[in-house]
Amino acid sequence: MIYMKKILTLLVALSLFSVKSSAQDVLNEILRTSDIIINDTTKSLNTRKVALFKFDAMTYLRSKILPPVVMLDKKANADTLNAKIRFLNEQAYAMSVYISVYQKRMNEAKEKNRYLVTSLFKQATYDHKLFNDTDTEYVMSYYDNKECPIQFCLDCDWVKTLAFIRSIDWSKI
């Protein structure tokens, strides 16, 4: 009986470990899949540009939250690092959902309302800054670029921006 309890406890612990591990891989998975899409010449140019935005947004976010200097610091607190990784992955997940919601709303919108949908989504990324980065040339590089299908600000709190967009009554648009 005690042996069974130990095995059961071990199985539960292993399953929790694997869930935690996979939850911490959101950002890396977005970077990995985006890189594959960017380099896949069989994909449409728009699809590749969306992947490039995701890659750039996640690279920017990671550089601000978890620069290499922090990762290489032997004195870095494990709890602090884990909190930063958790934050990065929450932001990465929210960004991915945000882009999916944007694409869905654009597909559902009537032709005459597409400009409004784009404006709302763009403005939301601008209004919900995460870092208040002064390098506006960089963080706004996609924002007014007509060549990009995703024209969002890189300096964005994706969790708050997603919550804002979800609060809009889309039935009237």
Locations of the language-model features?
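Alpha-helix boundary/N-cap detector
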Residues: 25, 46, 115, 152-159
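Short, aromatic- and cysteine-enriched interfacial helices/patches
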Residues: 17, 25, 57, 130, ...
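Surface-exposed, polar helix/loop patches in the mature regions of secreted/periplasmic/lumenal proteins
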Residues: 78-149, 154
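Immediate post-signal-peptide N-terminus of mature secreted/exported proteins
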Residues: 24-72
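Flexible helix-coil transition and linker loops at the boundaries of alpha-helical arrays
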Residues: 73-77
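Bacterial Sec-dependent N-terminal signal peptides
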Residues: 1-27
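Short, low-complexity, Pro/Ser/Thr/Gly-rich segments in the mature regions of secreted, periplasmic
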Residues: 154-173
